[in-house]
Each structure stands twice: as C-alpha cells, then as structure tokens.
Amino acid sequence: TTPAPAPAPVRHAFTRRSLRPVNPLKELHDLAGLFPEPADAPLFLNARHVAREATPEPYRTMLVHEHHMTISMESWHHCSVDVEVLESRFQDGLYLRKIRLLKSGTSRVVQFGYVRFNLELVTEPVRREILEERVPLGRILIQHNVFRHVELGAILQFTAGPGLAHYLQMPAEADTWGRLATIFCNGSPAIDLLEITAPLE
C-alpha cells in the first residue's frame, strides 16, 4: 500500500497578533486550554495532525474547505443549527468562548469548539450581536455582510476523552475529526477556531 502523505506545514498561525509558523498540536492545546477540563476528565485522549488529502470521507467533505462550518453543518444535516455558549469571557482584550452547535430546536449536538475573537476588527452592531450569544458566529458575519474569508489551517483526528464524549454525546475512546481555522475580517486575522464535528455516519 502507498503510505499516507505527511501533513503539509501550516503556513501561518491562528494568532491574534501576527502571522507566523506554528505547530498545529501546540495551537490545539492553546485553544483547548482557554477553558481547561478537569484533570480526571480530559477533553481528548489523543490528537494527531493529518494531511488534508488523507482525511477520510465523510469528514473530508465536512472539514476540508474554506467556508464557515455553520454552513457546512446546515448543509450536511439538512437543517439550521443553533449555538449553545457553554462558557465565555474576555482575556487580553479578546473575546473567548466554548460552544456547541445543535440541530435547530433539538438537543442533538453536531459540533463542539472554541473561539478566540478580536472584536475590534468588526463593527459595533456585529459585536453587539455576537455578545448576545444567540446566533452562530458564521451566520452573523454573513448576515452583516462582513468582508471576510476563512483560511483552513490543519485537520486533526481525535480520540475522545470524557470531556469530548460529554460535549459531543459520543462514546469515550471513539474517534472523530476536527480542524483549526482562521477567519480574516476586512483583511486582518480576527478569529481563531477549533471546530470538532460529532461523529458522522
């Protein structure tokens, strides 16, 4: 068999201040560390960086693109999604939050993740709606016609620990997939994301 291709280097950081090379696993731990889990219930047992072209279906379709995950989730699940903000706070002038996306009107979780956002890069109406924590971030940016683009950073495979099993309603020690991405607003890196999908059938 042909060996799986090695992951390509990540071209820039998912960083609030500058573009620089990073280790995706370090960035993963930095984002997950914004809201640490208890030591006896870690978020994941293992995580590895996987080349985009080695990502299996259906996760490749779900994750390997430069679009908002809100749109991908709604397309895949054939319904709108709601956001549930589990925790949020400000740190060093940045807005941080831990979230889940749910199939609209249900308790079915489809995505878990972390957001690190420099709100200075969007207008006051956009900031206000984001801080209300009622509408998914991607939908707000689209509805306000914010000039933006999504840059995919890295694809990650996870073995769920008790934390991820709880948040995604999945078995512990089972695998799922996620990604690191950056959203640029008005030409500047504004939003760092860790987005992990619930297991797909």
Where are these regions (language model features)?
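Generic alpha-helix initiation/capping and coil-helix boundary signal
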Residues: 1-2, 106
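Compositionally biased, low-complexity flexible segments
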Residues: 2-9
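N-terminal domain-onset segments
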Residues: 11-96, 100-177, 184-201
